Swiss-Prot record:
One of its GO terms (biological process) is L-tryptophan biosynthetic process. GO terms for molecular function: 1-(5-phosphoribosyl)-5-[(5-phosphoribosylamino)methylideneamino]imidazole-4-carboxamide isomerase activity. Pathway: Amino-acid biosynthesis; L-histidine biosynthesis; L-histidine from 5-phospho-alpha-D-ribose 1-diphosphate: step 4/9. The active site is at D8 (proton acceptor), D129 (proton donor). The gene is hisA. It comes from Clostridium beijerinckii (strain ATCC 51743 / NCIMB 8052). The keyword Transcription regulation does not apply. Its main location: cytoplasm. This is 1-(5-phosphoribosyl)-5-[(5-phosphoribosylamino)methylideneamino] imidazole-4-carboxamide isomerase. NCBIfam families: 1-(5-phosphoribosyl)-5-[(5-phosphoribosylamino)methylideneamino]imidazole-4-carboxamide isomerase. Transmembrane segments: none annotated.
Amino acid sequence: MIILPAIDIIDGKPVRLYQGDYNKKEIVADDVFETAKSFQDMGAEYIHLVDLDGAKSGSNQNHELVIKIANELNIPVELGGGIRSFETIKYLLDNGVARVILGTIAMEDEELLKKAIAIYDSKIAVGIDCKDGKVYGRGWLAASDLDYIEFAKKMENIGVKNIIVTDISKDGTLEGPNVEMLKKLKRTVSIDITASGGIKDIENIKELKNIDLYGAITGKAIYAKTLSLEKAIEISKEGR
């Protein structure tokens, strides 16, 4: 399993939301680039960036910053949030971003998703953001009738290699991840699963590692200092 430290971006600043609520925004560091570099210095193998402006409105105002990070660090960077056209996918991947995470567009435009996978294969991941078993889109602002298990199976059938699963009700809470939800998903699909939302401490990292997931994304726990990133990385590498 790999650990992906997360940086959520609003107006070029590193922030955290509580349960995806844009009104519960907290700036967690001074500078996005320096935060990303510090994660690399601590031994991170991959960095997870979320463009919250993009997720909410589809804007690309943070893309220049993301590309700078992708090109100046020595580790791969993935980006999610507001990526809703093939042109944007191409622009980001052609300019150094290692993987893009599609959310809303994966729900709304199957043909675009298939085209992106045909060309970029594993550089395309799909974010499955859910609450009470239902998938959400538009920066977690829009509920759908899609069941998260059925949606994950559909993504696997389309050819998606990697899904990032977030329990919105856990995000930013430090209450621990939704382990049962992740176990159920792991039993159902054979593609790579990255868990996001709720991680608090090293015990949570051990729990997720025991499920044999591809990755675990953690943000707030690092900023709140309830989790040592170096220790989490060390545990994630055991037995690799």
